[in-house]
C-alpha cells in the first residue's frame, strides 16, 4: 500500500535526527560511510540554518539551535516539538542509542506534518513493525555529514538502509527525493539534520 510504503520509509534514523555540516570544500562523496573523515569541524555548529520552518524552532532551551548543537541527534530531536512523531518512531525501532552513538551522520528528519500525511491506522501499524520501521528510518540517515552545497549540486547520497536518496535544488528550495527541506543545516553534536515535509520511501519497499 502506497501510504504504508511512505510510512515505512519514515525515518527511523530520521527520528533520531542530528546535524553538523562540514565545509563545502570537504563535502563527502556519496559513498562515504559512518564516521567518515569528512565530518564538520566544531565551528560548523555556527552554520547558517535555512527554510521556512526554522522560525518555529524554540529561541532558547534544549530545543533551540544552540541547545541542539550540544546534544547527540536523537536527544536533540526529542527537544524539538516539531519532531515528536519521529522521536516516537525512533524509540519504537530501538534506534535511540544507535543514533546517539553514531559519528558524523546526516539525518533527513520528517516533521510531524510529514507523518500526518499518513493515515493514522497505517502509521500505527508501521510503528508496531520494528523491522519495517527500522528500514524506513535508516533510509533517512547517511553515514557522513553533508553540506547544503552538496544537496544543491545533486550527487546521490547513500543511506544506512543501503539505497540512495537524490538531493537537488528547485526554484531555490532544497529537496530530497520528493520531499522539501523546511529547515536545513541544523547542527547536533554528532549530526547535521535537514527537516523535511514528507516521509521518504526506500525503493525496495
Question: What is the role of each PLM region?
Answer:
Residues 2-205:
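Mature, structured domains of secreted/extracytosolic soluble proteins
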Amino acid at each position: 500500500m502506497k501510504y504504508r510504503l511512505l510510512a515505512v520509509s519514515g525515518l527511523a534514523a530520521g527520528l533520531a535526527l542530528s546535524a553538523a555540516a562540514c565545509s563545502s570544500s570537504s563535502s563527502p562523496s556519496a559513498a562515504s560511510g559512518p564516521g567518515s573523515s569528512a565530518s564538520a569541524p566544531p565551528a560548523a555548529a555556527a552554520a547558517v540554518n535555512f527554510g521556512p520552518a526554522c522560525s518555529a524552532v524554540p529561541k532558547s532551551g534544549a530545543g533551540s539551535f544552540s541547545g541542539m548543537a550540544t546534544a547527540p541527534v536523537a536527544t536533540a530531536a526529542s527537544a524539538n516539538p516539531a519532531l515528536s512523531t519521529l522521536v516516537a518512531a525512533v524509540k519504537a525501532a530501538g534506534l535511540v542509542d544507535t543514533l546517539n552513538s553514531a559519528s558524523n551522520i546526516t539525518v533527513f528528519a520528517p516533521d510531524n506534518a510529514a507523518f500526518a500525511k499518513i493515515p493514522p491506522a497505517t502509521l500505527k501499524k508501521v510503528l508496531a513493525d520494528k523491522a519495517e520501521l527500522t528500514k524506513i528510518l535508516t533510509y533517512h540517515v547517511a553515514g557522513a555529514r553533508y553540506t547544503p552545497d552538496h544537496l544543491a549540486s545533486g550527487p546521490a547520497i547513500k543511506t544506512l538502509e543501503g539505497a540512495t536518496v537524490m538531493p537537488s535544488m528547485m526554484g531555490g528550495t532544497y529537496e530530497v527525493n520528493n520531499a522539501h527541506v523546511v529547515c536545513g543545516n541544523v547542527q547536533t553534536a554528532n549530526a547535521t539534520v535537514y527537516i523535511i515535509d514528507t516521509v521518504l520511501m526506500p525503493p525496495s519497499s
